């Protein structure tokens, strides 16, 4: 008799095996085992058979489930141990105080619910604690991310809202939205989010919209394969850029406003020089993914110190690099690629188990964050060749469609008239280097998904 089981447990096991064999018409085997154990047929009446005939199968399937759960927990333990191993004693104590090394963690500070369908996009107000979300329910909702409260619901679009973005124009901070209804709408936050303009011109769903820094312009990307540049004041389309052969899924302007990065269904990412709006120039086409490119991002200058060595740039030359030196793309092939401006792929980040839906660079420059249809958010350390150092598993209950980092807070400092204007974009690209402004990183990240939720991660 097994020393692992008590006498009662052994008897239960024997009865379960005999009942299982009998239920599956293995009567000879059941009779042989019953004889070997010295059990009479009277022991197995109808009631006993019913009780034990499925017990063995239930035990077996429960063991398989437990084994899977154990394996998942072991994998999570390994990931957490790796994160601990990568952290120095000082970094562990300072991480919460140092914005440059802060990373989001679960649980989220708030999980905001009000949308009735998939939340496709989010955008932070550049100054206040407001955040906008757009949904398949055709609505835009404005929230206070510090308080976790709904402030307003904007109605105007007639189909899914696919993109939102805050930006600073001549008239102040504005909110732009785009939709499957083929329109772009501009809303004025200082006037109760009044819809002040509707831009028409695209011939299919408008998938992304972004303000172009410092130029009173908007750029939009569409399923009609075009990029369009719009004058925010007049609402006129000032230029249509053609080049993609499929749906343009995403567009991202450079921090100085002179370049556009676009990507989409033709499995390419393209860099455009729009210094001269009337004559945009295609500068670069990046090819390397194996499936649709869902998202793209321009690296901030704070990332250059980590990425430049991979591109063969010497340390002393990093400060001389331009506004668009490195970019990242996320694809349905489950990978993220980081490129230099020559079109060389510096690294391919592998780890997600499903489509990559959104990517964002940490304002401090050291990390790249991504979200995926595998319901996780991953943090990649660019100083360690893109190693995944943190995973927020099950960050949402379904696919994660959007991920944004709150823009930096810029505090102007006094400077001489000839020392540069001291201004910076939302990710810290300095425009005046003699007396740079005080740029404060806001440790706030938002994600949104098919579970109809908007999650806020904050320090």
Swiss-Prot record:
Keywords: Cell cycle, Cell division, Coiled coil, Cytoplasm, Cytoskeleton, Microtubule, Mitosis, Repeat, Transport, WD repeat. PROSITE patterns: LISH (PS50896), WD_REPEATS_1 (PS00678), WD_REPEATS_2 (PS50082), WD_REPEATS_REGION (PS50294). Pfam families: LisH_PAC1 (PF24951), WD40 (PF00400). GO terms for biological process: cell division; establishment of mitotic spindle orientation; microtubule sliding. GO terms for molecular function: dynein complex binding. GO terms for cellular component: cytoplasm; microtubule; microtubule associated complex; spindle pole; transferase complex. WD repeats lie at residues 114-155, 157-197, 201-240, 243-282, 288-349, 351-390, 395-434, 436-459. CDD domains: WD40. Residues 9-41 form the LisH domain. It comes from the Eukaryota. Its main location: cytoplasm. InterPro entries: Dynein_regulator_LIS1 (IPR017252), G-protein_beta_WD-40_rep (IPR020472), LIS1_N (IPR037190), LisH (IPR006594), PAC1-like_LisH-like_dom (IPR056795), WD40/YVTN_repeat-like_dom_sf (IPR015943), WD40_repeat_CS (IPR019775), WD40_repeat_dom_sf (IPR036322). It is found in: Cytoplasm, Cytoskeleton; Cytoplasm, Cytoskeleton, Spindle pole. Positively regulates the activity of the minus-end directed microtubule motor protein dynein. May enhance dynein-mediated microtubule sliding by targeting dynein to the microtubule plus end. Required for nuclear migration during vegetative growth as well as development. Required for retrograde early endosome (EE) transport from the hyphal tip. Required for localization of dynein to the mitotic spindle poles. Recruits additional proteins to the dynein complex at SPBs. HAMAP family: lis1. Belongs to the WD repeat LIS1/nudF family. Self-associates. Interacts with nudE and dynein. Dimerization mediated by the LisH domain may be required to activate dynein. This is Nuclear distribution protein nudF. It comes from Talaromyces stipitatus (strain ATCC 10500 / CBS 375.48 / QM 6759 / NRRL 1006).
């Amino acid at each position: 008799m097994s020393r692992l089981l008590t006498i009662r447990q052994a008897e239960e096991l024997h009865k379960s095996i005999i009942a299982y064999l009998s239920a599956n018409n293995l009567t000879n085997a059941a009779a042989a085992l019953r004889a070997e154990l010295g059990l009479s047929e009277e022991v197995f009446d109808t009631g006993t058979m019913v009780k034990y005939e499925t017990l063995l199968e239930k035990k077996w399937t429960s063991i398989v489930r437990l084994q899977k759960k154990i394996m998942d927990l072991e994998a999570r333990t390994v990931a957490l141990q790796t994160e601990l191993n990568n952290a120095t004693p000082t970094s562990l104590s300072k991480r919460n105080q140092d914005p440059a090394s802060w990373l989001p963690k679960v649980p989220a500070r708030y999980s905001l619910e009000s949308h009735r369908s998939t939340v496709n996009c989010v955008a932070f107000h550049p100054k206040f604690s407001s955040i906008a979300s757009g949904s398949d329910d055709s609505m835009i909702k404005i929230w206070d991310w510090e308080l976790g409260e709904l402030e307003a619901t904007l109605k105007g679009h007639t189909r899914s809202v696919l993109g939102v973005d805050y930006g600073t124009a001549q008239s102040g901070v504005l909110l732009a939205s785009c939709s499957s209804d083929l329109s772009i709408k501009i809303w004025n936050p200082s006037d109760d989010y009044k819809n002040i303009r509707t831009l028409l011109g695209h011939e299919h769903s408008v998938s992304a919209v972004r303000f172009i820094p410092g130029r009173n312009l908007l750029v939009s990307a569409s399923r009609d394969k075009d990029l369009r540049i719009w004058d925010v004041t007049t609402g006129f389309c000032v230029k249509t850029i053609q080049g993609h052969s499929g749906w343009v899924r995403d567009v991202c302007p450079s921090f100085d406003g002179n370049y556009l990065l676009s990507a989409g269904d033709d499995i390419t990412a393209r860099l455009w020089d729009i210094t001269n709006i009337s004559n945009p120039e295609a500068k670069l086409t990046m090819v390397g993914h194996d499936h649709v490119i869902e998202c793209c991002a321009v690296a901030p200058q704070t990332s250059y110190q980590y990425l430049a060595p991979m591109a063969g740039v010497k340390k002393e030359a990093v400060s001389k690099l331009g506004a668009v030196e490195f970019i990242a793309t996320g694809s349905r092939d489950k990978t993220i690629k980081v490129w230099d401006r020559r079109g060389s792929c510096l690294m391919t980040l592998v780890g997600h188990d499903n489509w990559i839906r959104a990517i964002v660079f940490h304002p401090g420059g050291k990390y790249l964050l991504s979200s995926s249809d595998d319901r996780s958010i991953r943090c990649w350390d660019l100083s360690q060749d893109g190693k995944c150092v943190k995973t927020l598993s099950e960050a949402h209950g379904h696919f994660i469609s959007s991920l944004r980092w709150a823009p930096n807070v810029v505090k102007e400092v006094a400077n001489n008239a000839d020392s540069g204007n001291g201004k910076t974009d939302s990710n810290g690209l300095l425009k005046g280097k003699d007396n740079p402004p005080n740029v404060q990183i806001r440790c706030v990240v938002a994600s949104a998904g098919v579970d109809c939720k908007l999650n806020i991660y904050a320090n």
